[in-house]
Amino acid sequence: MSEFKRIPPEQAQALREQGAVVVDVRDPATFAALHISGSKHLDNHSLHAFIQGADLDAPTVVVCYHGNSSQGAAAYLVSQGFSDVYSMDGGFELWRTTFPSETAQGTSE
């Protein structure tokens, strides 16, 4: 079984530019206030549907607040058969200072 990889925002952006799926595991209100453009909100309610419809081999970047919770979520996705999973170090807080123009508001992309 493969393991997830921890990456900095710059590598997450490079993967994103190549079409990686970005999932955000922060709470819904925080996600709606500001998130990475094109990211999908993932929580206990949307997780099953996300896994059912996902390409398990597609690069998938998991984002949280500071890069801690995303590691658990990334490990869970690997356990569900995802083969190319990344946890972004520094989380959205580091992302928004590194790539402020690559953010969006609203509940879905």
Curated annotation (Swiss-Prot):
Catalysed reactions, semicolon-separated: thiosulfate + hydrogen cyanide = thiocyanate + sulfite + 2 H(+); thiosulfate + [thioredoxin]-dithiol = [thioredoxin]-disulfide + hydrogen sulfide + sulfite + 2 H(+)
The EC number(s) this enzyme carries: 2.8.1.1
Covalent S-S links between cysteines: none
Rhodanese domain boundaries: 16-104
Gene Ontology, cellular component aspect: cytoplasm
Active site, renumbered: 64 (cysteine persulfide intermediate)
Domain of life, source organism: Bacteria
InterPro entries attached to this UniProt entry: GlpE_sulfurtransferase, Rhodanese-like_dom, Rhodanese-like_dom_sf, Thiosulf_sulfurTrfase
Gene Ontology annotations of biological process type: glycerol metabolic process
Compartments it resides in: Cytoplasm
UniProt xrefs under CDD domains: GlpE_ST
GO molecular function list: thiosulfate-cyanide sulfurtransferase activity
Gene3D superfamilies attached to this UniProt entry: Rhodanese-like domain
Main location: cytoplasm
PANTHER family: FAD-DEPENDENT OXIDOREDUCTASE (PTHR43031), THIOSULFATE SULFURTRANSFERASE GLPE (PTHR43031:SF6)
Descriptive protein name: Thiosulfate sulfurtransferase GlpE
Organism name: Pseudomonas fluorescens (strain Pf0-1)
This protein's encoding gene: glpE
